[in-house]
Amino acid sequence: MFTTSLRQAQRIVVFTGAGMSTESGVPDFRSSRGLCKGNNPEALASLQAMNDNREAFVDFYRRRMEQLQHVQPHKGYDVLATWEQQLSVTAIITQNTDGLHERAGNQRVLPLHGSIQKLYCIQCGQHYDVDRYMNNQPSCSCGGFIRPSVVLFGEPLDSNILALAEQHSIEADVFIVLGSSLVVSPANLFPRIAKEHGAKLIIVNHDSTPLDTIADYVVNDKPIGSFLVETNRALQK
């Protein structure tokens, strides 16, 4: 049983994808066409859109931020916060930009794609909260443009966060995937790296993934929140 592996582990790494967020009511990014007024969301969440179509760019992210104001982290996030304190969770690598991990009190989050909950000026670097976009004020006092602190299409991932995620994956005894299809590179390399370095690999996802065949445990029949709550309950026995 994987609960034994969790109890014995010295380093547990958690990897979360869109499925973790959708259980809290966050629309999957690629299903958020209602925000885009007929445009492809990937086209609006791009470096080109930020440079050439700022009105639509700001409108897209403002609507996304409005959605997140009505969302609360589900109980699975609380379990991860508990595991950070009571088990040896060394990192939570996430593909999500919604900030739900941080809102739930998760401390060791590595956001591969940044956070929509943070803004900064591209000219002077001044940081702002989301109120600037909510109030449709995307201009800094210096005159620069204020953007979300997310990785846009056309931009590279943060090399420092990638390096940390890789190191934690190498050192993991147990690597848990929660709600990721594991098809997006380079993020999908981390569970493979962990497995190659001896970690137990647990995959919890609604659908099958390309790495199911190398996983030690695969769970397709439970919501992520329920899986985490039930696993935590079993660990208390």
UniProtKB/Swiss-Prot annotation:
For activity, the cofactor(s) needed are:
Zn(2+)
Catalytic residues (UniProt)? H113
GO CC, alphabetical: cytoplasm
Taxonomically, the superkingdom here is Bacteria
Provide the residue positions that the database annotates as binding nicotinamide. Answer: F29, D98
The catalysed reaction is: N(6)-acetyl-L-lysyl-[protein] + NAD(+) + H2O = 2''-O-acetyl-ADP-D-ribose + nicotinamide + L-lysyl-[protein]
Residues bound to Zn(2+) are C121, C124, C140, C142
- Compartments, as annotated in UniProt: Cytoplasm
What are the record keywords, sorted?
Cytoplasm, Metal-binding, NAD, Transferase, Zinc
**EC category name:** transferase
Q: Which residues form the Deacetylase sirtuin-type domain?
A: 1-237
- List residues binding NAD(+): A18, T22, F29, R30, Q95, D98, H113, S180, S181, N205, I224
- Give the E.C. number(s): 2.3.1.286
SUPFAM superfamilies in alphabetical order: DHS-like NAD/FAD-binding domain
Matches recorded under Pfam families: SIR2
Answer yes or no on keyword Metal-binding. yes
Q: Which GO terms describe its molecular function?
A: histone deacetylase activity, NAD-dependent; NAD+ binding; zinc ion binding
How, per the record, is the cofactor bound? Answer: Binds 1 zinc ion per subunit.
The record ties this protein, via InterPro entries, to: DHS-like_NAD/FAD-binding_dom, NAD-dep_sirtuin_deacylases, Sirtuin, Sirtuin_cat_small_dom_sf, Sirtuin_class_U, Ssirtuin_cat_dom
User: Is the tRNA processing keyword given for this protein?
Assistant: no
Family from the record: Belongs to the sirtuin family. Class U subfamily.
Q: Function, please?
A: NAD-dependent protein deacetylase which modulates the activities of several enzymes which are inactive in their acetylated form.
> What name has this protein been given in UniProt?
NAD-dependent protein deacetylase
Species this protein is from: Shouchella clausii (strain KSM-K16)
> What's the name of its gene?
cobB
